[in-house]
A protein has these predicted regions:
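Extracellular Ig-like/FN3 beta-sandwich strand-entry sites
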Residues: 237-239
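A short, structured loop/turn motif at beta-sheet edges
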Residues: 210-212
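Beta-strand signatures of extracellular beta-sandwich domains
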Residues: 206-208, 257
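Edge beta-strands of jelly-roll/beta-sandwich modules across compartments, strongly enriched
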Residues: 248-259
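Mature catalytic domains of secreted/periplasmic carbohydrate-active enzymes
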Residues: 1-173, 177-201, 208, 218-232, ...
């Protein structure tokens, strides 16, 4: 799935039933785990709040792969190889960077140790993760809307420090957060995290950068944030804009950072 909701139907693991009773919860249609959409408004339209649960996504993957495909077993076999650091990094961006927990299975040999190539691949993967977060870019944050204008917001600037105690609730009359850099430079990634104490709220948002000619360029039309969203930017810019298009009540952010 491209998007992972944490708020899903309780009925998703039950046997399917036809939706014939307006108020009969036992007749609510099952949403199978393999469905493309587990938690959008459309998917949950017939469910009440009592029919929902918090069920975070988990992505399990083995570092091993078979010679002819990328799938490997949970145990060590000599005829299998290890996935490379670039492959593991892409998986990380598409799992941990899209509101899922990334669980990497690393099987030892029959002697109970990790072979040399496994250790090498893990070190290379770890180095790539460190490089992602090793060069934070400072910014001054502004929030507002097209109607009311933009104003400097110290609370949003403070979100660059990733701390569970951080929180900024975007007011009902605001939908834009601008991150103004100290100077023009290349931004590789935008990292966003919601404060999940208040549940998962953001449903759609766009990311823009200001070009060197002063125009706004859309980088990506995104959907969910949740625990973490990593947006690839890869552009030189002086300003990054987050435009919240749709949310379930006011978004609560705990972390906003550029790298």
């Amino acid at each position: 799935r491209d998007e992972e909701w944490s708020v899903v139907s309780k009925n998703k693991d039950y046997n399917a039933g036809s939706q014939t009773g307006e108020n009969d919860k036992s007749n609510l249609a099952t949403i199978p785990d393999t469905a493309k959409d587990l938690g959008s408004r459309e998917a949950l339209a017939d469910y009440s709040a009592d029919d929902l649960i918090w069920y975070p996504a988990e992505a399990d993957i083995s570092i091993r792969r078979r010679a002819f495909n990328s799938y490997g077993g949970w145990f060590y076999h000599k005829n299998e190889m290890n996935k490379g650091a670039n492959k593991l990094f892409r998986v990380y961006l598409n799992t941990a960077g899209r509101n899922a927990s990334f669980l990497l299975n690393v099987p030892p040999t029959k002697d109970g140790v990790l072979d040399a190539d496994t250790v090498k691949k893990l070190k290379e993967f770890g180095d790539k993760l460190k490089s992602l977060y090793s060069n934070p870019i400072s910014f001054t944050a502004y929030s507002g809307s097209a109607e009311k204008g933009m104003a400097e917001n110290a609370a949003v600037t403070a979100l660059s420090m990733d701390s569970p105690s951080n929180d900024f609730m975007l007011p009902s009359d605001e939908d834009i957060i601008d991150l103004k850099l100290d100077k023009s430079q290349k931004v590789r990634y935008l990292v966003l995290r919601e404060n999940l104490t208040y549940s998962q709220r953001v449903e759609r948002f766009d990311v823009y950068v200001k070009t060197l000619t002063g125009r706004w360029k859309k980088i990506e039309a995104c959907k969910l944030i949740g625990n973490k969203r990593i947006v690839l930017i890869g552009e030189e810019t002086t300003e990054v804009r987050i435009f919240v298009r749709q949310s379930r009540s006011n978004p609560h952010f705990r972390h906003i950072a550029l790298y």
